[in-house]
From Swiss-Prot:
Domain spans labelled DH: 200-390
Described function: Promotes the exchange of Ras-bound GDP by GTP. Probably by promoting Ras activation, regulates phosphorylation of MAP kinase MAPK3 in response to EGF. Catalytic component of a trimeric complex that participates in transduction of signals from Ras to Rac by promoting the Rac-specific guanine nucleotide exchange factor (GEF) activity.
Ranges of residues in domain N-terminal Ras-GEF: 597-741
Gene name linked to the record: Sos1
Protein name: Son of sevenless homolog 1
Single Gene Ontology MF annotation: protein kinase binding
Subunit structure: Interacts (via C-terminus) with GRB2 (via SH3 domain). Forms a complex with phosphorylated MUC1 and GRB2 (via its SH3 domains). Interacts with phosphorylated LAT2. Interacts with NCK1 and NCK2. Part of a complex consisting of ABI1, EPS8 and SOS1. Interacts (Ser-1120 and Ser-1147 phosphorylated form) with YWHAB and YWHAE.
Annotated Gene3D superfamilies: 6.10.250.3060, Dbl homology (DH) domain, Histone, subunit A, Pleckstrin-homology domain (PH domain)/Phosphotyrosine-binding domain (PTB), Ras guanine-nucleotide exchange factors catalytic domain, Son of sevenless (SoS) protein Chain: S domain 1
UniProt feature, compositional bias: Pro residues: 1194-1203, 1238-1250
Region span, Disordered: 1019-1101, 1121-1319
Amino acid sequence: MQAQQLPYEFFSEENAPKWRGLLVPALKKVQGQVHPTLESNDDALQYVEELILQLLNMLCQAQPRSASDVEERVQKSFPHPIDKWAIADAQSAIEKRKRRNPLSLPAERIHHLLREVLGYKIDHQVSVYIVAVLEYISADILKLVGNYVRNIRHYEITKQDIKVAMCADKVLMDMFHQDVEDINILSLTDEEPSTSGEQTYYDLVKAFMAEIRQYIRELNLIIKVFREPFVSNSKLFSSNDVENIFSRIVDIHELSVKLLGHIEDTVEMTDEGSPHPLVGSCFEDLAEELAFDPYESYARDILRPGFHGHFLSQLSKPGAALYLQSIGEGFKEAVQYVLPRLLLAPVYHCLHYFELLKQLEEKSEDQEDKECMKQAITALLNVQSGMEKICSKSLAKRRLSESACRFYSQQMKGKQLAIKKMNEIQKNIDGWEGKDIGQCCNEFIMEGTLTRVGAKHERHIFLFDGLMICCKSNHGQPRLPGASSAEYRLKEKFFMRKVQINDKDDTSEYKHAFEIILKDGNSVIFSAKSAEEKNNWMAALISLQYRSTLERMLDVTVLQEEKEEQMRLPSAEVYRFAEPDSEENILFEENVQPKAGIPIIKAGTVLKLIERLTYHMYADPNFVRTFLTTYRSFCRPQELLSLLIERFEIPEPEPTEADRIAIENGDQPLSAELKRFRKEYIQPVQLRVLNVCRHWVEHHFYDFERDADLLQRMEEFIGTVRGKAMKKWVESITKIIQRKKIARDNGPGHNITFQSSPPTVEWHISRPGHIETFDLLTLHPIEIARQLTLLESDLYRAVQPSELVGSVWTKEDKEINSPNLLKMIRHTTNLTLWFEKCIVETENLEERVAVVSRIIEILQVFQELNNFNGVLEVVSAMNSSPVYRLDHTFEQIPSRQKKILEEAHELSEDHYKKYLAKLRSINPPCVPFFGIYLTNILKTEEGNPEVLRRHGKELINFSKRRRVAEITGEIQQYQNQPYCLRVEPDIKRFFENLNPMGNSMEKEFTDYLFNKSLEIEPRHPKPLPRFPKKYSYPLKSPGVRPSNPRPGTMRHPTPLQQEPRKISYSRIPESETESTASAPNSPRTPLTPPPASGTSSNTDVCSVFDSDHSASPFHSRSASVSSISLSKGTDEVPVPPPVPPRRRPESAPAESSPSKIMSKHLDSPPAIPPRQPTSKAYSPRYSISDRTSISDPPESPPLLPPREPVRTPDVFSSSPLHLQPPPLGKKSDHGNAFFPNSPSPFTPPPPQTPSPHGTRRHLPSPPLTQEMDLHSIAGPPVPPRQSTSQLIPKLPPKTYKREHTHPSMHRDGPPLLENAHSS
């Protein structure tokens, strides 16, 4: 028995695990009920759980045996009126329990645990009663905190928010912290600093929207809490009495709600290209309707001289005080002192309108909006002059600021100012002890002088929301050096939640007095100098004491109204979009925190997606953008327009049988309900349908250009829309359509103005107009790069998101669906082939070296112009099979240009890590490499299912579309900035008409290129053939510096190797295997074969060029060793390296014919850029450690790159990010050279083609020079592959004397690193 009587410890080590987390899921559900647009983090819900368990402990201490015992405990322990509401909820729960479970908290589990807590079996009904009380208090806490969070314009409830909000709520503080002296809340300095500086137009609009929402809540408080008791008791207060006190407050409330709705609609419908929301028309329309006139008559009534006397006379009527006291504790005092101050708030708010309109007119960047503001200001001149005249007579005498009339805290307007004020006050008080003011208060209310009855001297009072500080003035200067110079000396301080305010009538001893009653029964009486001063102090003190009670009264009233006036929707049979949400038609993301409190859709039916696209409760602009970008993958444009029209045409709900009987009797039961339905459902839905239409024609007009019938239907639909609220949106859509039609008929117009003039066109040997002489060596390399950059920039900027979604560029209708993307693919492939052709058709070695050198100069200018697509085109050409094998040519390329080429190749290594870092570090304009986007889109499309199945229903996987839209959004962010360069029409035309293949088929052309390569540099180790010169003009390059640099002309962006401080690639770990911008992971496809070995470490998608990522494929004569290889530990177990495609075993032939590989024809667009097969473990072309032969040229070239765009792969490889490797013995039908890809090191090698040549051997590199030593390199930190190690031996220079004394490298040889150490 003794053990049972010991108090139960909820938070002990033994019991805490039983309760921890028990209530959190239910609390999350409760929070969703009271504030559906907010989110709560786990810490916040766990803190609420602790509070509820604390409350449960308090209820269980009374050892309840029946519901009446619990009720009695609640009445004794809970503050009024929360006890009354909690009991009412509990009783309701017991009654409903017989029919269904109305509770969110787990009543059954709590009932089971209560037997252990109490030590005896408790009746189930008592448990339900207790749980209902707990749920009510939890809802009350979350409702209070949610209001605070919305007030500070946040979207997530945190633990700190709960502490701050509860600290300002006397009711909850009394309940949970009755015996705690003071509660420490974090200082406001932890919050983000307040923004200082000049506000923009959009800042003003956002601030005003938040302010008017709070203002509307104040009006609701006046009307629903204070005015309602006067209206409901016609015996005490006549309608004339109510009119005299509250004047036209209802009209003002209606105007405020209408104004907020107009502004919200305008902000929602604002075009992305607009500088800011154009809210001028909102004020102009209402001003022309004379909607602001009630403010003038209201101010006249409230500020008339006899108003206060009449107001007090109403309260002094017989029975009035008793009636008001019966409504709630302190309600009579709140009416007497708080209501008069609240009634002044509309006056100050109206005066604020006039100031706001002037500020908005000044900040507006739109001429039409400025004109609307002027018209609104002019229309309000009469109201403004009348208001100012009334206020100048009355408000000046009252000496009240606007903040004094505010019921709700405005601390977030200037938190830093509040902190500064608190700190200044505390420093000015001598003898301060205890915690700082800022640790127990959030807001400074007021200060002034009061007389404490019985004291000799006056007290200077500082009133905060949590403290009342009474000080005595320090008279005279300090006598001793170092003594405090504070102006005040602390006498006493009162915690506002621990005191009771009592009004005192005037007596002979004191006048204008009030009493502060402490919890221990002692009291202090203060008197003011006048009745007006007393009213000011009482208004502030009563507001602090009863603010939470009044807010709860408002919330209860609003909730009750919502229950009584539930909006009735049409039946789902009549209106398909009225079907309730369920798991069979819509799913939401569970682990994603929405930023604006709007749920994020994971999947849904088309109808549900359209419903949420035009939802009546909130707007979701991100969803609108994503939907219009991706909808074509699951819905045709004609179907979308039909659904939008169906959504727009909303039928009104049919009357019930009771409604029909009432109508027959002459009543109008549906009038109020229909009015609400039209206002809260029909109007917002129709506006959002128009908003979707406007976005559609503005940003996706190509849908209408491809289908004239679609455009005609849209225009007919817009023409049928009626209603004043819709007028300006209809006009906006009509203007957009007309503008788009004109642009379509006249062609694209470019009217771009640059800050500086573009640079002059550079010429070399060829001259303007002589297009027949244009060639790689006759045109200036700077101008070739510039004109190609302009051309590729135009092609890149022309690609629309719809050409990418659903991988439509790989589908049957690609010419229709992806015309601009295919143009870019074809241009890039043609340019790459042209570079290859220029090189291999130049037979003479000296001229060929000049051609390669000129191409590298073009690459250098590409880098300076941030044309990454062009850079990778050049790299691809240099890495192609016909060019890659030209060893003798690359030997004569200057080392500086080799370094430039190697650095360019490094952009594609390690999953394009350096390219992505470079792209993020530069400023537009630029031409990004498109292939990486297409790869990411293809992986996302193919790695995620089109639909999700739930309960036998198929839901559109919108999460997948959202990921694709994020990629297209990244593409679009680089499409806005054009180049400040001058178009040279002839050069542009020359490159637009490039056709290196002529009439040849691609297989035939690639065979020709490779055979030509073999002709100019044969495989056999014999003297290089001599060829006559092809060109009669000088081969010397004009260089890559502009010939006429002028001040103010465009300077090329700094090339990669010249800006090590912007981005140092040496600081990027080469060992990382994941790209920083890899595509979203997707599920493994069921047909994907597992890796051949668990030792594979490079299965990610890699370079588009299929060349060695760890060593340069170029012909560097420096002793460069792969930085990847060198990073391996020396104690690693030697593992045979994967077989490089360029190496052949002794028994295998050395060459493969390209004619056996290429099988695609020119009728399908070629892909860009071509690529080489690559692997992380490929050895460098001239590696120190594995090149043992000094006689043989390099091995046979890599596999030829395909020229086709990607076909949708059937399945992916073991990782969802990889394309499936080709089957054994069959060449992969790449068709997707435009996509970065890397074969697995364990992919079976391609079939070998017999060759008459012998075994290939490796050529050694020249010796490592002192300048190239790792510790002596003084240049920028890129590229890392130029690093060397002291462990690498120095080898003799390469010679071309053919010797067959060295063994060739076999597939089972040791890795590079081990070779290096062993040699």
